[in-house]
Amino acid sequence: MDITNIKSIKGFQFNGKETKIGSATTWTDIINENLPSCYDMLKACAKEVGSIQIQNLGTIGGNICNASPAADSIPCLLALDAKLELSSANNQRIIPIDEFILGSRKTKLKQGEILTSIIIPKEKENGSSSFRKIGARKYLVISISMVACRILISNNIIEDISISVGSCSEVAKRIFSIERQLIKKDINEDIFNQVDFSQLNEISPITDIRSTHVYRLKASQLLIKDVVKDAINKQEIAR
């Protein structure tokens, strides 16, 4: 059953406390929408999903519910503290995205439910963001590692930061160990020499046909540095 033409689950809804993204919103819709810079990571992710044809037809809701370990949207939505609105004929419930995906291709969707929207709290729409992924090629590829970062800086101090890694575990993970080291750091100092980027205990990279677990871990460490630097630079330029 194709539900992508249901208007009520397409596009963006903005209000004073949250932003709702309809589950049938396509990647092209996301690319073309005028959004705050905290969504730059989601736009960057959208531009690298599959091919242009897939971006025109594929939806963010489909990417989430497919529950692939390499689902591009999940690290970005984790970094935005997203919640998911699940609806059935008789009920509606909202759960955090980090509770929705149980494992590879496994979700908390019940029989008769569909994902209707993704909810982003207003307080997470501040700051800047960045997204990077690595694979055998740029498009039409299952990633080896991907990283998303959202950062809020005030008076040169990192006030809030979220970092998420995908393709390195059954489920994408927030990297709280690195976030804790970066919070309250002065960006004018050499923060990257003050942080131990090897401490990625939240993920469990595997060896498969695309990569060894050692390469995945090293790639993730480097991508984390890249996205944090990029997000900091974006916010400095915007000031």
Regions found by a protein language model. Give the residues of each.
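C-terminal structural segment of proteins
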Residues: 1-239
